Amino acid sequence: MNIIKSITLLLTLLIVILMTVCSPRESASEVAKKYIDKMNSGDYETAYSLLSKDSKKKISIENLEEFQNILVSTKRIISYKIGKEKIIKKYKHDGKEYKNVVKLEETFNIKNLLYKKDDSLKVNRYFVVENNKYKLLLYESFKKEFGINSMDLAQLKLNDFGLKYFKEVDLILKKAIAINPTDSKLYYAQACNYMNFDGFPGYSDTTYNALDSINKSLKYLDKNDSDYKKNASNIYNLKGVILMFHKRFDEAQQYLNKSLYFNKDNEDPKYNLNTIKKHLN
């Protein structure tokens, strides 16, 4: 009987030891905090070491540094809070399915430099275990946030009018598109900026570039977005405007009418259709 008890106790101890050995020393919450703190302090090498293997295939250390530079140019983090850990048995990230993923919601209190107001930002983070350590699945949220912050920075740059700023915005948007080449809103912003080059010597081809960008914006437009119709209306209106620049008025009218089809309350295509009508008369 004592032998059986001893064996049972030994097995229990072995299980406890194995569980202790197999469990990551740092929790997902601790890794999340370390990532935020290292990014804020500029220790990108350590921050990068916290990414999952798959995330590192899509994101470089230079990308992290560039992300942070854009972030601090558009927002100031006042404080942040990390929510409770939640286990997700199956989670799909960047086309790949992961098991037993830890989800965390991070809440940031920020000062938005573009809109000059305090705001709250919520970000979901997902962690997987690699070599007995929690690693951050970053690519999906990274590319989305990179695009949003890049467009904010572009808007800040455009507070000043001039070729110098248009060229800076062009570079900002091209880098963001390289990170997220299927973001409809980035292509829309790029098309808008290309139109700013009109009239400057040596940039006569930019309106053609704008047409290419607006077509890509249409191609990658998310039909599941709650603002799909509004976004579609704005894109079709801009395409109509670009075609007006090229004096392709019949085509322009078609796209401006499409813009109204998606949003009959959009005043811009109404104005542009009226402009064409006056021009043709």
Regions found by a protein language model. Give the residues of each.
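Exposed beta-sheet edge and beta->alpha loop/turn motif
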Residues: 88-159, 249
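Hydrophobic/aromatic packing residues within the alpha-helices of TPR/SEL1-like helical repeat arrays
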Residues: 166, 173, 211-214, 221, ...
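TPR alpha-solenoid repeat register
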Residues: 186, 227-228, 235, 269
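Single-residue signature of alpha-solenoid repeat helices
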Residues: 169, 207-210, 252
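Short solvent-exposed beta->alpha transition segments
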Residues: 45-101, 106-108
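Flexible helix-coil transition and linker loops at the boundaries of alpha-helical arrays
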Residues: 174-182, 216-232
